[in-house]
């Protein structure tokens, strides 16, 4: 056994370093905070985003956009999703039961993403021009 080969026992843990507890520890007196200044004082930190009195970036940039309040009540369904539904008559209730739109949805619109190869009847749903054309090309129809 030699001094340079000493190891702590298995499962041993180092004690947490205690600052400000004497010069011999290497972290006494100023406790690693340096001399004077805001950061050396207790409670000496500014809030996040504070830039020393300069107008903060968040306030320098213009506001933009808004959050739509109707977003959660309007659903969007792809043609490819309608292809997978087991029913031929599609309305809002069928979409809710299939989990394609949320329970709070009051209206839905079909968009032309994906392919539709079978005949379906759409009741009470909106559709984009492309989606309407694709449904009618597959032999489907719209009933209001």
Swiss-Prot record:
Complexes and interactors: Part of the 50S ribosomal subunit.
Gene this protein is translated from: rplO
Disordered: region residues: 1-56
GO CC annotations, alphabetized: cytosolic large ribosomal subunit
Keywords: Ribonucleoprotein, Ribosomal protein, RNA-binding, rRNA-binding
One Pfam entry name: Ribosomal_L27A
Function, in words: Binds to the 23S rRNA.
Cited InterPro entries: Ribosomal_uL15, Ribosomal_uL15/eL18, Ribosomal_uL15/eL18_sf, Ribosomal_uL15_bac-type, Ribosomal_uL15_CS
Biased composition (Gly residues): 21-31
Domain of life: Bacteria
Organism, scientific name: Burkholderia vietnamiensis (strain G4 / LMG 22486)
Protein name: Large ribosomal subunit protein uL15
One Gene Ontology molecular-function label: rRNA binding
GO-annotated biological processes: translation
UniProt-listed PANTHER family: 50S RIBOSOMAL PROTEIN L15 (PTHR12934), LARGE RIBOSOMAL SUBUNIT PROTEIN UL15M (PTHR12934:SF11)
Family: Belongs to the universal ribosomal protein uL15 family.
Taxonomy of the source species: Bacteria, Pseudomonadati, Pseudomonadota, Betaproteobacteria, Burkholderiales
